[in-house]
Amino acid sequence: MPNFHRVVITGIGAVTPIGNNIDEYLVGLQTGTNGVSDITLFDPEQHPCKFAAEVKNLQSENFIEAKESKRWDRFSQFGVIAAKQAFNDSGLEITEANASRIGVSIGSGVGGLLTMESQAQILSHKGPKRVSPFTVPMMIPNMATGLAAIALGAKGPSSSVSTACAAGSNAIGDSFRLIQLGKADAMICGGAEASITPLGVAGFASAKALSFRNDSPQTASRPFDAERDGFVIGEGSGILVLETLENAQKRKSRIYAEIIGYGTTCDAHHITAPSPGGVGGAEAIKLAIKDASLSLEKVDYINAHGTSTSANDKNETSAIKSIFRDRSYLIPVSSTKSMTGHLLGGSGGIEAVACILSLTHNFIPPTINYVNPDPECDLDYVPNNAREAQVGVALSNSFGFGGHNVCLAFSKIN
């Protein structure tokens, strides 16, 4: 049997629609802050959906030089800022001696969509010679990883996962596995996304995936509510620093929590719709629990994928019930997307951070805008107000277009 390393979280960073650092994000989760408002990043007048969950008042100059920021897409800026926050928080130092044992993996479902759109406009109106030479490096989805590695000097395993809305969670899970197997000593990992653009909003609207509550946008993201009608697109990044328990103890680091399980599957069913009954998601949950050697009674909280779409919320509820049976009704299940909107490939990162904050501060974030119970969604969704609770083990679900399913298991450190 291989000698698996225990893997702990020693640093966290977040850029979100409800807070641009960990302290702000924690307060937002505890108070049920609503991050949804009218779109300001472009003129949405011609669009059927005119609202989103934007990152607001971000002081990027504290992390990125002004000259550099002009050469980085918005999603990469979010990823690097959150990575620097997490790295600084961890107290980890990268030297020539350890650089090749420290890696980066930041998932993104879409990558540099803003760059792609703006340069396509230049190509169309001004011709090919006016297209920026930075176009390709700005828009490719691995560049948040690349820029973070350059900024921090991390020369170890480097990757960018692109499994749609499961990308951030896959990046964390894959990083966990690398450290567990001894292939790396530490990983900076999570997700980043910035798709609140004309094409991004129009594309999801045409797919009937978005809510169109333009008259009351702050009530639009309502996971598990009977009157849910689509998700609210968000943006931002959540990043963790993972490292071996031995390494963290050796340098006397603060340890937030331990990552103990990872399950990932594919529905192989449909390009956008989940498999009936959420069977693929259920299998990912089952695999994470088995990987963690957990009994079902140990799970204290589930951070749901909870997108506020009819299909996801119903099928995710079914998936949870198929695994936990009668105990499903005793486990608090909440969707922080009710506050942050759906960050697509960035969602797994900020939701992993939410689980870690839940473990360390003993509370469960709410599902806000939960007003009308749905008979098909009949679990405890922690409606509208955060709840004090002793949380020892938390699960985080992420499901993506293409049938990608991920479940991560976190626990207090023993």
Which ranges hold each PLM region?
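Conserved beta-ketoacyl condensing-enzyme motif
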Residues: 9, 24-26, 30-163, 192-203, ...
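Glycine-/small-residue-rich "gating" segment that lines the acyl/pantetheine channel
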Residues: 125-132, 170-173, 177, 186, ...
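Active-site-adjacent elements of ketosynthase-type condensing enzymes
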Residues: 44-54, 111-115, 194-221, 263-283, ...
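Active-site-proximal alpha-helical scaffold in enzymes
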Residues: 79-92, 141-144, 149-193, 232-253, ...
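A glycine- and small-aliphatic-rich helix-loop capping segment at beta-alpha/alpha-beta transitions
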Residues: 23-30, 114-128, 178-181, 201-214, ...
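Flexible, low-complexity linker/loop segments at domain and module junctions
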Residues: 1-9, 96-99, 292-298, 329, ...
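ACP-dependent fatty acid/polyketide chain-elongation machinery
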Residues: 1-68, 246-256, 353-368, 411-414
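Condensing-enzyme catalytic core mediating Claisen C-C bond formation in acyl metabolism
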Residues: 6-10, 34-38, 215-292, 300-301
